Amino acid sequence: MISARFSGRQGDFTLDAAFDVPGQGVTALFGPSGCGKTTVLRCMAGLTRLPGGHLVVNGVTWQEGRQITPPHRRAVGYVFQEASLFTHLSVRENLVYGLRRARGPLRISEAEVTQLLGIDPLLRRPTATLSGGERQRVAIGRALLSQPELLLMDEPLSALDRISRDEILPYLERLHASLQMPVILVSHDLSEVERLADTLVLMEAGRVRAAGPIAAMQADPNLPLIHRPDLAAVIEGVVIALDPAYGLSTLQVPGGRIVVPGNLGPIGARRRLRVPATDVSLGRHAPTDTTILNALPAVILGAEAAEGYQITVRLALGASGEGASLLARVSRKSFDLLGFQPGEQVVARLKAMALSAPAQTGG
Amino acid sequence: MTEGILFDAAMLTTLALTLKLATVTTVLLLALGTPLAWWLSRGGGLWKEIVATLVSLPIVLPPTVLGFYLLIAMGPNSPLTDLLGFKLSFTFAGLVVGSVIYSLPFVVNPIRNAFVAMGPRPMEVAATLRASPLDAFFTVALPQAAPGLITGAILGFAHTVGEFGVVLMIGGGIPGRTKVLSVTIFDYVETLEWDKAHVLAGGMLAMSFVVILAMMLIERRYGTGARR
């Protein structure tokens, strides 16, 4: 359990942010730029000191009002927006800078980190010759090797171009899957959050608007996320079958089974799906004679008006709505023609090809 | 110009004294100037600007003005002399004190600029990697500011070798004790020993050229390195 509250003024900006999130998994601090995400993260590291508030991480108190543990006495790893490698040290010296100073039991070794992040070929290169993505990987490895009990990441991908970002995301997903320590990730990119985060803390103008599991936050009709044009539902499942002849994998998700293109094996692996709301259509009966592979029973929970004569329909998978939450964006006309009502059983059709399963998450 | 002039004993004594003064002054300046430069480089405030101004005063002040006040402070019946129990004026120690004050800006300013250019980030990174502030100062701040430290040391050394007004005011030019190169050149000119003046002046010209060239080369090398 991570319990945080920071309040105080910094110039014209007033911060009063409080949230309690699980002491494991990835929590994303999400919001527009200037909403105070980075300030909260800096307060969590002790780099910024606001006299009001507290911070307790899995039973260890790092701040209680004006009693603030200095950053070097906290078991915290921090990945800055820019890699900020020490230019006077080699890649390897950068990596072990924190390791040499770490106290307590060794949780992750140099060999594990270099393997996890693919740093091995970089060790002997001068920091000046590394690409942006390579530098950020070294910075993440350096933070991990300081044996943190909490890893803080401040938009680690935002300074990178598209290619470096795609190169580094799989490493982050692997971290997520293989590390026990809680991670707080600052981001203003929702797709990044949807790939990585379990818990979402939604920030607005120095305050926390809401916090909770990402799927619940996406489907909350009182939060602004539901109005986004790129609305999607994040669903986690387990691979239960592979069909190499057709290049398909079947995932068991709460309340149903979803067929996804690609080999997502091995059987039993946990995978995360992002289902865009615009790729879900609704009907009363299971379709016949259609190219759509996925037709799942679901229950309508509610409907919200969306831009452009559309309706956002909140659904729960399963015949009695016991499963994962799903979102559909359909035209107002078809919604009214079919006369859907909350509580009604429907069949949700998912365009199989639209499903994207980030490779290699879970294990 | 003959061999005899180069090996003039008085000249060698003067040269040795000058190098000793410059070395002691430079070491003291690095030891005092680096923490001072660090303090000045972190954050603002009126107090820091006032101290920074005081540090920079010797750049614009005529050396005789500085020497005059130092002479009074180090002379008989001054509070400093009462406190110490002995006079600093016309002693080697007095020269060192004067040189440290006179060359302070030439050492502090390049080091301060290097610390400012570094920004707060490297120290923050070090703190999140469990380095205490002192640890981070020695393992991150000093190595990152190395070009500034080298520039400061060279400038401080060269400036001390070349000073004239302050040492003449507080040292007087006692052979073997307070008579440095620049004062010796002045004496040679006064007594029309042009050959000897030529040797010393030419030597100082060459040294100054080498110092400035070395600084440019260091700057170029580290300058490109720092942008990594």
Swiss-Prot record, chain A:
UniProt-annotated binding residues for ATP: 31-38
Keywords, comma-separated and alphabetical: ATP-binding, Cell inner membrane, Cell membrane, Membrane, Molybdenum, Nucleotide-binding, Translocase, Transport
EC number: 7.3.2.5
Topology class, membrane: Peripheral membrane protein
Cited SUPFAM superfamilies: MOP-like, P-loop containing nucleoside triphosphate hydrolases
Coiled-coil annotated residue ranges, if any: none
GO molecular function, one term: ATP binding
GO annotation, cellular component aspect: plasma membrane
Domain of life according to the entry: Bacteria
Stored PROSITE patterns: ABC_TRANSPORTER_1, ABC_TRANSPORTER_2, MODC, MOP
Major enzyme class: translocase
Domain ABC transporter: 1-230
Record localization: Cell inner membrane
Subunit: The complex is composed of two ATP-binding proteins (ModC), two transmembrane proteins (ModB) and a solute-binding protein (ModA).
Role, per record: Part of the ABC transporter complex ModABC involved in molybdenum import. Responsible for energy coupling to the transport system.
Protein name: Molybdenum import ATP-binding protein ModC
Biological classification of the source: Bacteria, Pseudomonadati, Pseudomonadota, Alphaproteobacteria, Rhodobacterales
Gene behind the chain: modC
UniProtKB/Swiss-Prot annotation, chain B:
CDD domains: TM_PBP2
Origin: domain of life: Bacteria
Residue ranges crossing the lipid bilayer per the database entry: 21-41, 54-74, 88-108, 133-153, 154-174, 198-218
Ribosomal protein among keywords: no
InterPro entries: MetI-like, MetI-like_sf, ModB_ABC
Keywords for the protein's UniProt record, in alphabetical order: Cell inner membrane, Cell membrane, Membrane, Molybdenum, Transmembrane, Transmembrane helix, Transport
Record-level GO cellular component terms: plasma membrane
Pfam families: BPD_transp_1
Record GO terms (molecular function): molybdate ion transmembrane transporter activity
Domain ABC transmembrane type-1: 15-217
Location (main, coarse): membrane
Annotated membrane topology: Multi-pass membrane protein
Keyword Transmembrane (UniProt): yes
Subcellular location: Cell inner membrane
Quaternary state and interactors: Homodimer.
Function noted in UniProt: Part of the binding-protein-dependent transport system for molybdenum; probably responsible for the translocation of the substrate across the membrane.
Protein family (similarity comment): Belongs to the binding-protein-dependent transport system permease family. CysTW subfamily.
Name of the protein: Molybdenum transport system permease protein ModB
Species this chain originates from: Rhodobacter capsulatus (Rhodopseudomonas capsulata)
Classification of source organism: Bacteria, Pseudomonadati, Pseudomonadota, Alphaproteobacteria, Rhodobacterales
Gene: modB
